[in-house]
Amino acid sequence: MGKEDLYTTRKVILYIATSLDGFIADSKGGIDWLHANAIERETDTSYEDFYSNVDTVIMGRTTYDQVTEVLSPNEYPYADSQSYVLTSRQTDNTKDITFTNKSVVDIVTDLKKQPGRDIFIVGGASIIKPLVEENLIDEYQLAIIPTLLGEGIPLLSDIKGNLKLTATQAKVVNNIVYHTYVKN
């Protein structure tokens, strides 16, 4: 497989949970509602299956802070991947985490030219929107939580352009509906 083949096979994947009414966080940025309707009937390996093909993660600073301070304060869950955190705040890089003020479009465009495995777009909404508008997301994996928030941070808002996707999978596991879409 040549370098050009790797460019075409490395996918940019948005893997994210959303409420039934399309919010990725409540009006205060909280995500406690994610587990409110959890029903553990069977082993759900959806995330593990997805993440096993990832070597790069991209997120905004707010998402990074939520991951490191609330969700997993004792252990960075993406330590086995190269992380890019988009921020205007000056922060020292570590071996596996690059803090940058580059545009997410430039970062993804550069990464797609490099050999590697899939690129995981963690969030948040301000990171997702320009990637959608530039049609840089190859696959959308949405976990729909059966909760109506009524207000909050929307997954997609005021997107410019028209993007057609193809549904490739839908499944229900433990009261969560997983939808997968790929760009045409």
Q: What is each residue range found by the language model?
A:
Residues 2-184:
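Enzymes that bind and transform nitrogen-containing heteroaromatic metabolites
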